[in-house]
Amino acid sequence: MQATDRTQPKPGKSPIINIKKPQSFVLDNGMKILVVENHKLPKVSFNLTLDNAPFAEGNKKGVDELTSNLIGNGSKKTTKTAFNEEIDFWGVDINFSSHGATANSLSKYSGRILELMAEGVLHPNFTQEDFDKEKAKLIEGMKAEEKSVPAIASRVVDVLAFGKNHPTGEFMTEET
């Protein structure tokens, strides 16, 4: 019986990654724009990053996460359902948070996608109903983590490493 050859094959050549230098400019409102063009694929990616310094939320810990969960649920101009249906119709991958937004789609829809992204960021629709649902979800998540050893260990490590008054050392409670 012959032994199976299990020697590792020699690696092939590493691909060459060529990222062009971004074009940069500043809009009238002070927003810095970086553009990197690559026309090999018919897709476009947008990334909005808000330069928010970390801050201690104190007795309001969880507001940032709650805001992140609420943003992108429609806008003051468009209902949540219509907003989500249009995103689905265009086949867009769009995400919002309190720190910015990202969107990926086919480049032929880029104008409308950028409009939807701006609408969601500049005119978010925070309804009481959505607020109550998201708050309930956060509370349920915290209750589930009460008995999770990794979650408890992570909290302890963060408090010991950063202190309880540091943004990373804080943790959410039902009261906050």
Where are these regions (language model features)?
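Acidic/histidine-enriched segments that form metal/cofactor-coordinating
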Residues: 85-176
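His/Glu-rich zincin catalytic helix
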Residues: 1-90, 102-105, 115-116, 175
